[in-house]
Structures are given as C-alpha cells and as structure tokens.
Amino acid sequence: MLKKQQRIAAASPKTVLGSPMANADLVADSIKRASGLDVDFIVFPELALAGASLGSLLSHPHMLDLSGRALESICRATENLSITAAVGYPCEINGSVRSAVALINRGSVLATSFSDCAEAPFGFIPSVEYHLSKPRSIFPRNINVVFGNELLSSKLSVPDGNVTLIPSFLNATAHSDRLISEALRRYTAISGFAAAYAAPNSGESSSFFLYDGLCAISAGGEIIAMTEPFSDDPFVYADVNAAWLASAKAVPVMQQPTYYLSQKPERAAHECRRILRLQAEALRRRLEHTGGRGFIIGVSGGLDSALAAIAAVKAADMMGLPRSGVLGVSMPGFGTSIRTRENSRKLCEALGCSFREISIVDACAAHLEAIGHGTDKRDVVYENAQARERTQILLDLANMENLLDVGTGDLSEAALGWTTFGGDHLAQYGVNASLPKTVIRRVVAEAKAEFREAADTLQDILDTPVSPELLPSQAGEIAQKTEELLGSYEMHDFFIYQFVINKEKPSAIVEKAIRELPFDPGEIRRAFDVFIRRFFTQQYKRNCAPESPHILASISPALWRMGSDVLPDGSFREGNAGGTENA
C-alpha cells in the first residue's frame, strides 16, 4: 500500500517518426517539465523514441543504434533529477527485436522490461489475446510496468507494486476511448494500484492507424485525469495516496463492442462524432505529410462522397485552411440522375467548398469507340470505363492543383468488391475504407447538427437510394439500385462484422442473422451466398487498396492478409465457387 502521497504523470510529446535523437530531446523536456511539478513517476508511450508506427524500420540496425544513443542522451539530460521515467524504445534481445521500456532515474537505467509483441505492432484489435511481457530485470518494489496491450488481456495478473506505469502503442478507434478507460478503471480497482497510461500521438504515421496521444491517470477504480483526444499538449498528472487506493468502487465490467455502434443512443451518437473526428484527423495528418494545399473529392451526390466531403471540410477547419481548398468534382456520366447531380452541387455550395462539374460522357464515348466497343453495348466494360475515367480526372487534377485525392469507398463495397479495379477502387487516401455503409449513414445523419448549413441537402442524400449510376435511365431517374442487386447493406454489414471481427462460422452467421435481422430466411441465405462468393473472389482489389485509417473494422492489406486466388469451397458456402469477377 502507498505510504505517502505520490504524484504521477503521463506524457506523449509529438513524435518525430524515425528520429530517435529528436524524440529524446522531446522526452527529456517532458521529464524536466514533470520534475518541475514535483512529479515522482512519469510514463511515455511504447516505442516513443522511434515511433510505434515505424514498422519494419524498427528492426533496422541503424534505428536500433540510434535508439540506444537516444536513451543514453535522456539519461545524461536527467542525471540530476529524482523523477523516475518509463521510456519506450526498440531493442534487440537474443537476435529478436522487441519493444522495450527503460525505467530511468538520476541518469541511470534502473530496470528494463520487454514486450513479447512482434517487432511491428499491429494496432488496436481487442479480439486478440496478447502474450504478456516478461521483465528481464528487477523493478523497484513500488513500481510495476504493464504494456498497453496487456491491459486488455483477460490473462493479466496483478504483480507486486503500488504504481503501475503503462506505456502503450494502441491506436485510436471509434471505441478505444471507452475500452481503455474501462480497462484502467478495472485494473486499478482490482489491483489497488495507481496507474498512468500513455499512448502514441498524431506524429505517428496515418497510413493504417490513427493515434490520439491519450494520456490518463487512474486510481481506486476511477479516472482522475485524462487528456482530450488529439490534444496539442498530451500531458497529465495527478496526486494519489492511500485514501484513493482504498476507496475503489465496484469493479467495472469491460464491455467489448457487440456491433459497430453502441445500442445506447447517446453513446452511439458520441461514437459517430468520434468517427468523424478521427476521419478529419487522418486527413489532417496526411495533408501535413504530403504538403498539399487542400483536398479533392469526387462528389456523386451519394452517402460516401458526402461523408468524405464533410471530413475534408472538418480537417480544413482544424488546420485553419479555407474551405475553398476542398474541391468537389461532379463528373456526370451516362447514368447520372438529376437528383444526385444537383445534390453534388448543393452540398459543395452549402459547405463552402470549391465546385467543378466535368462531364465524362464525351470522353467515355471516345474511349469506347477507340477500343472498338461502342456505346450501345451496356456491359461491364461500358460501366467500368466511366469509373476509370473519373479516377483519371481526379488524380490528374490532384497533381495539377497540389491536392490530396480523397477516396470515398467504404468497407461494405470493399468486402463485396463493389468497386471498379483501377477506378473508384483507387485514390491517394481512403478515408471511409473502415466504415460500413450502415454506419456511414448514421455518421452523416449525426453530422447534420454540426453542419447545419448543409442539413437539408444531407437529408436528401440520406433519402437517396444507393446506386453506382452507370447505366442510362429514363427521365433522369436512378436506374440501378445496389441493394436490389446485392441484397440489403444491413445484411451485408452484419455478415462482415460476424465473419471478419467475430470470426463466426458461416452456419452460425446465417442462424444469427435469421434470429436478429428483419428479413426472410431465404433472403438472408441468398445474400450470405453473395457475400461469401464476392468476399473471396474480389480479394485481388483489396490486396492493392490505397492506404486508409483503421477506425472501425479494416480489411486493408495491412490487417487482412489473404491470397486473391483463394476460393470459397464447401467450408464456407454450399457448392463450389467458380471463376473470378474481374470488374
């Protein structure tokens, strides 16, 4: 038990990715800042000296050497300070690169602990049961180090000590704030310890994950200090004493997500707002990295491009850029309806974006004639030529005007392969890629309150049937309705969650869908057969998908690894699938 009051802190100074010496200076400055506040213990994120998102470069001998030198630099800079700091860095042990945490006090490394995680951390995947770390040296009696991924493990035991420092590499998701808060409260309630938690920040790569620099202090089953997500100054401290630790409330139950969004309306609304914030942060980080002057989006008058436009506008606002730096491009083709064409323009005008309309009809007709196809044959070539023409226009304009081409494709489309290879399948960054269509609908609905100037147009977009609009229609109406062709997205998004996240057996997924979804059993079985067939045969598109942030559920090549020539046999569906669909 704690004998006296102690002050503990957590900090996540903005990472300079791949620059250990620069990070060492930032860490040393934070240690000095904490020491000036009479802090006794401070924790920094896992791999803070190199960057948690550095990937394979973490194991490069040069990076390991620089990280070791950076650690020595921190020791020299803090040799006269009594504060104890937990600093994360990559380290080679017996020929294997591991995430290490050094406990530094008065210029010396008191102890080091090593995680059993692979050299390239793979992000926040709550369903994974992590291996626990094995300390390689003895810690002072009153200090304990637990890695962030262990905090979520059901196998985490309570070691000796009364202060737990938790360096983490866990990324930000729609649910991570709640999960980490509940895990900290549970840990401190059970252990009787105080705990300080620090996660990586927005200086990390946004290629596949986002990091919000979450820092928190917990004691007695309560969160007593926590930073705001993506804070400009992720640094917190708090005083804890024996009274705090003795006053633990009832042990909180860790509730893993049971579906994409909470069943509680207030929590679901919070998650929708957080999703949009994460999307905007991802775009901000990517634009800062590329040095572009703004964003370009192909606006179709549909849900996906509406959300991408909103996220881009929010990112521009956060960066202090004019909304005119967001360019929405409408590219009407053979099947574009009057309604979606008008909504594309109205949305951009309401949001204050720049707007441009470029018809692709003549360009596509010329292309089809040039390859000997003609415009009277309404097949897959006819449809895909339009999608590829739009992508070419967007990428060329992005180059010409120094803009970031923001992809609009979503998780549902990626799972079903409902994209054109080399067409809307490509972009410079896919901001919607981890969000299913049904969630996008709810995020857009929630966004109406924030973007009131566009609320009427957003509502009309919400009321518009989902369609690729690639086939001509009569009287300017929508000819193709995706859910009439594939089945309801409510079913397909359910299948994705159960198959990819819960990893349920196909038979169990169908049985669960019949129990829980408002559809005829025969319709559910037909839709599931479509889902499984297309999920397997369309993998080749996902294997070369653009980089995208993992916010809800990802089947990007960084997280879902599967050969494109794997076919669903009797293990996954009745009968054998044959052939591939090279759309």
Regions found by a protein language model. Give the residues of each.
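ATP/NTP-dependent adenylation/nucleotidyl-transfer catalytic domains that generate, transfer
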Residues: 4-7, 18, 192-193, 205, ...
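Enzyme catalytic cores with a strong preference for nitrogen-chemistry domains
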Residues: 1-298, 309, 314-325
